[in-house]
Amino acid sequence: MKKYIKIARLDHWIKQFFIMPGVAVALLLTEHSLTDISLLNLFFGFFGTCFIASANYVINEWLDAPFDKYHPVKKNRPVVTENMQLKWVLVEYAIFIVFGLLFSYLVNKLFLYTSIVLLVMGIIYNVKPIRSKDIVYFDVISESINNMLRLLMGWFIVTSDSIPPSSILLGYWMAGAYLMATKRFAEYRMIGDPSTAGLYRKSFVRYTEKKLLASSIFYALASTFCLGVFLVKYRIEYLLCIPFIFLLFAYYSAMSLDNDSAAQKPEKLYKEKKLMFLVLLIIVLFIICTFCNFDFLKPLTSSALIKLEV
């Protein structure tokens, strides 16, 4: 039983906290307040997302087993090393789906629909004939859509009357793509041998360190541009947070260059003290900029030229 629980990656449930920015954005942009949030909706929403994610992890572990044996760490996964049966893996997959969709239904219909899309994306990513994880660049783009879906799920916990602005949706999607490309880059460097890397992950046959690094820079630029549009459009005070967001991206990129980089395991990033300090600093700045007005920034919202007195 323990090995079947392990492939559900319960330790990865911490990543489902990526729904919380969706909650925060909904509170910022709609008429709802913190007291309007149903704790039951928050509970069902969070754990519904966790169950759907675990369903995707289960099929990921099973279908990746023939390739994981070439990875220096993943070769020790239960599906690779132990005699696990497909029928019980499918039963586990079905159980997580049932509970995930049930909990999602208890939030609202839009949350349920988004959960179904999250489930479908897991199939597209892992299951042939598409199996997008084997397709260069599309592997990152398709997997990181889940980041945008989590933002939507957080939003729908608060309100089902609207959807978030496209700028924050695209920015969050591209931030996920940046994290995934950086993870690929760190993983490729850690394996150290292109031929072995290609056996482990088919997309690595066409990737190189240069391509992965360049793509991560592209996603970072796309993300920060979209996030910048959102921040400046809805509250000019958020402009003060942007340099620290740039710093966060730069620091994370530097982390990916470390030997056996922590960027390979996003679920363990909470152990990176400097990174968490930066994240906490940005959160505090966002809170300050939400409740404080800085009049000296107001002229920046005007399209008029700044006049000089000679």
Annotate each language-model stretch with its function.
Residues 1-69, 82-95:
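Topogenic membrane-insertion module of multi-pass membrane proteins
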Residues 253, 258-310:
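Generic C-terminus detector
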Residues 48-80, 132-142, 178-190, 250-251:
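Acidic (Asp/Glu-rich) catalytic motifs at the cytosolic membrane interface
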Residues 65, 70-116, 151, 165-177, ...:
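Multi-pass membrane catalytic core of lipid/isoprenoid biosynthesis enzymes
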Residues 1-15, 78-89, 126-146, 186-217, ...:
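Interhelical loop and helix-boundary elements at the membrane-water interface
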Residues 157-240:
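Helix-loop elements that line ligand-binding/catalytic pockets
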Residues 25-47, 101-113, 151-171, 225-239, ...:
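Helix-coil boundary and interhelical linker segments in multi-pass alpha-helical membrane proteins
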Residues 89-130, 221-257:
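Transmembrane helix-loop-helix
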